[in-house]
Amino acid sequence: MAIRKYKPTTPGRRGSSVADFAEITRSTPEKSLLTPLPKKGGRNAHGRITARHQGGGHKRQYRIIDFKRVDKDGVPAKVAHIEYDPNRTARIALLHFLDGEKRYILAPKDLKQGDIVESGPGADIKPGNNLPLRNIPVGMTIHNVELRPGGGAKLARSAGTGIQLLGREGAYATLRMPSGEIRRVDVRCRASIGEIGNADQSNINWGKAGRMRWKGKRPTVRGVAMNPVDHPHGGGEGKTSGGRHPVNPQGKPEGRTRRKGQPSDRLIVRRRYATRKRG
């Protein structure tokens, strides 16, 4: 993938860029692997906003991705197409299996149209193949990693991400996450070889607010710029600091987003913030 820069013909075009989509081989998705994706606008069942800055955007259909691949062990598949997916930053690959079934997987770097991929403990070590962690050589870069055996891939699924397999000891494999966190995972968990493609996605300059609206992202407004009815930091004469510690619109302390005491916390060897420099 490469980045194509626009000429500065308008203020919105100045400095903006777009992916060149050179790796895309088909523009229309496989109909049998589509499902409706109704828009929620960030609202829950009561109509209250639970996810801010969401709404609008171009209409989409969800592409059904195979994140397990366990039921196709030993069945080779040919990469028919590399396609664009509006629901994720990674590209997706359409596989035609030898038994006639079609499925989507996340497209790793260097996977091309016409390649043969397979899954199972005896699969070759090449991009796109899916194996248990106990069968993958130490030092290999992997993606699409499960947290629990048979639970489906949860880690390293976005564009340009990859996890390094540092070692194995007993029933666990040690992995280095893209964030720098080091954690242990059951060796029965499965992973795909290689890193996710489309790594230049993070270098795209969107250029104008309108392009973000096409993606379904709404503006981020500061609480101190609102009225008291809309936010605990709102109101006051002139500009204010908010008058209290930062809170969200519901009045809960801002910044704490992760639940303490996750069952998998005991498997974390080193947290990601341990590598940061403290100033």
Curated annotation (Swiss-Prot):
Residues 40-58, 269-279 have a biased composition (Basic residues). Pfam families: Ribosomal_L2, Ribosomal_L2_C. The lineage of its organism: Bacteria, Bacillati, Actinomycetota, Actinomycetes, Micromonosporales. This is Large ribosomal subunit protein uL2. One of the primary rRNA binding proteins. Required for association of the 30S and 50S subunits to form the 70S ribosome, for tRNA binding and peptide bond formation. It has been suggested to have peptidyltransferase activity; this is somewhat controversial. Makes several contacts with the 16S rRNA in the 70S ribosome. It comes from the Bacteria. Part of the 50S ribosomal subunit. Forms a bridge to the 30S subunit in the 70S ribosome. Residues 32-58, 223-279 are annotated as: Disordered. The keyword Ribosomal protein applies. It comes from Salinispora tropica (strain ATCC BAA-916 / DSM 44818 / JCM 13857 / NBRC 105044 / CNB-440). InterPro entries: NA-bd_OB-fold, Rib_uL2_dom2, Ribosomal_uL2, Ribosomal_uL2_bac/org-type, Ribosomal_uL2_C, Ribosomal_uL2_CS, Ribosomal_uL2_dom3, Ribosomal_uL2_RNA-bd_dom. GO terms for biological process: cytoplasmic translation. Belongs to the universal ribosomal protein uL2 family. GO terms for molecular function: rRNA binding; structural constituent of ribosome; transferase activity. The keyword Magnesium does not apply.
